[in-house]
Amino acid sequence: MAVLEVCCYSMACAREAERCGADRIELCAAPQEGGLTPSYGVLVSVREAITLPVHPIVRPRGGDFCYTEQEFAAMLSDIRMVRELGFPGLVTGVLNADGQVDIPRMKKIMAAAGPLAVTFHRAFDLCADPRQAWKTLGELGVKRILTSGQQSSAEKGISLITELIAAGDTPIIMAGAGVRAANLPLLLQAGVKEVHSSAGQWLPSDMRFRHPGVSMSADPDADEYRRYAVNGEAVAEMKGIISAWRS
């Protein structure tokens, strides 16, 4: 049966994903940035409370995946922290300035991760040669690749996803970006064995007092009075589709 990984941005998200049938959780912060390294406090609390496998993302900032020496040093420190806290895996990725997998840095990441299962995230979708990148990551020992097939969604990138699945069993190809119940059958039909979905929704803040016109974001139009949450019904619906597909 295909694995359903749900991207979670808080303890509440993780609890809802677990309750509604997720098989694994990718733990992140900052949904507006596409996922950044969670805080130590969130890591500890989720590690203690959630029984599902949880793979934290290690990503120091938004934007591209070509990092300074200082940023990369911080990533290695975070990887060691994730390992020491006892997580079974992590999600990360680095590219060089030419859009290739940064092999020297990935070797350091793999050494720091040790026995942890490493997922190479959607930096893969920004690399110059995805076929060579798939081969390189396999040689490095990366467990899986999260990809939309180098398109804006996994549905649009189904051609490359199918090609990479046919190329071999390792690294595992996990389809992600825009995955939902409506297009999940298409991915399963293509032979995808792991899918990644945020199954997310924005909910209104519990704040009754509102101070309009003041934002904590660089975007003056950002809405401070909403929060990101996992939609449990969406998770359960996708899990139901996967379970029925098996039968």
Curated annotation (Swiss-Prot):
Q: Which UniProt keywords apply?
A: Cytoplasm
One Pfam family named in its UniProt record: CutC
Signal peptide segment: none
Chief location of this protein?
cytoplasm
Q: Does the record's keyword annotation contain S-adenosyl-L-methionine?
A: no
* InterPro entries according to UniProt: CutC-like, CutC-like_dom_sf
GO molecular function of the protein, one example? Answer: copper ion binding
Q: Where in the cell is it found?
A: Cytoplasm
* Cellular component terms (Gene Ontology): cytoplasm
Show the SUPFAM superfamilies listed in the entry: CutC-like (SSF110395)
Residues annotated as coiled-coil are none
Record's keyword annotation contains Cytoplasm: yes
Q: What NCBIfam families does the record point to?
A: PRK11572.1
- PANTHER family registered for this protein in UniProt: COPPER HOMEOSTASIS PROTEIN CUTC, COPPER HOMEOSTASIS PROTEIN CUTC HOMOLOG
Q: Which family does it belong to?
A: Belongs to the CutC family.
Q: What is this protein called?
A: PF03932 family protein CutC
Gene behind this protein = cutC
